[in-house]
Curated annotation (Swiss-Prot):
Region (G1 motif): 36-49
Annotated spans, G3 motif: 235-244
Region described as G4 motif: 306-313
InterPro entries the record matches: Aa-tRNA-synt_II, aa-tRNA-synth_II, aa-tRNA-synth_II/BPL/LPL, Gprotein_alpha_su, GproteinA_insert, NA-bd_OB-fold, P-loop_NTPase
Domain G-alpha: 33-415
Keyword hit for RNA-binding: no
Protein name: Putative guanine nucleotide-binding protein subunit alpha
A GO MF label: lysine-tRNA ligase activity
One term under GO cellular component: cytosol
CDD domains: G-alpha
Amino acid sequence: MSRSTHASGHMETVQVISALTDYIDQSKFAEIHSKLKRGDGPGESGKSTIFQIIGIAGRPSLSKSSEFSLKATEITLLSTCYHMLPDDYFGLLPLSSASVNATSTLLSTATISRPSFSVQTSSSTFANFLMSGTSWRSRRQRLKIVDVGGQRSQRRKLTAELAQDIKALWADPGIQNTFQRSSEFQLNDSAAYYFDSIDRISQPLYLPSENDVLRSRTKTTGIIETVFEIQNSTFRMVDVGGQRELANAHTELNNPIVQREEFVKQLRNRDKGDDESMEIDEGFVAALEHALPPTGGWGLGIDRLVMFLTSQSNIKEVLLFPAMKPEGKNAISYPPGTRCSMVRVFPCCSSTLTFSFCFFFSPFFMTVILFVEAAAMKVRGGYSGTCLSVSPRFSNGGDVLWRTSETKRDKYNEKRHAAVKTPAQRSFLESGWNTASDVKCCSIRRFPYLPLPLSSSPFRFPPP
């Protein structure tokens, strides 16, 4: 089986040898070869075959005639073209049809069909390179879906009364000031042009001029996160840098059959009253039927990029107007200079617990109280907390790790069991109160300096 590929802009042929003995999983040999079509283009029999995009894993080798070959150990069908491609000489489309069905024209290797396409692409690439340092923005869209989502929702006609209301609002100084700061509010840069021409546009016999058409913008489809499954497991691709999530990656759906099914689901939502649901876009599905290669991408927000460049751990540090909790609502008051953070506790029993504790620092000594609050408290009158013997250990990053001693904890549990007074309290202690599932995740309060002995501290804890 042979397969032609493109390399450095030239057509080269690479021979792929697919033998049953070379496959790791021989059961997939018959399965994949039942889907693949031999050849690429008109063969010796004179019959054109269907264009396919496949992925091949194997090892390179040389044939007896010293021809470079690839022995395949696994072949994956990535995308299939469900249409016959036009022949270079006998299958050219008329110019009018090629303008509408540009997908087949672009896939054709005939240079006489539309030579301006290659010049157009090269010119656009060179222009983008020249204008990369300026505010110039290309207004040409490669793919436009005119009838999408809310654009078809109930549109109101621009009547004379509505035009006067819009004109009065546009004359307001506050609106003018807002438009001057349009970059902050992401307003359409053509809004001023249309508002100034509202009297002309609202005429019943209005015909758009050339400038009206050039300044108009059509809502296009965007790319959102795409969830894909591999071996019945769902994965999310995340670009991570400096132990922080920077961007979510996504892959495009290139299966036209599945894409049509998704459009049908959207139509069902439309029948239920969802006006934002899309109709079946036959042009988009037809383009997918011409074998879209595996496509992926990712989007990095400016805020996360600034976080990465400025080494900020919280996105609120880079936002101009972050969402903050109002003062006085569900807020806990701490002494001046208090800092809150989270610390993880790693007991010797391999269970990860998160505790709430306080530091009491003084110039001469440091006393640490570890306060554990059981989330599964079911007994009234029982202790709501306990103190454990801990030994501090500081990590390189400045976080504090606390490792409990299993021996000390067992001795403490024996004392606790001996001190209980009611069967209900004994039942609560025997139900595993010191496991990770029974402990709340609490905040950590750090007091940098408190020159008070523990006995006279204003903070009260339950007795051990």
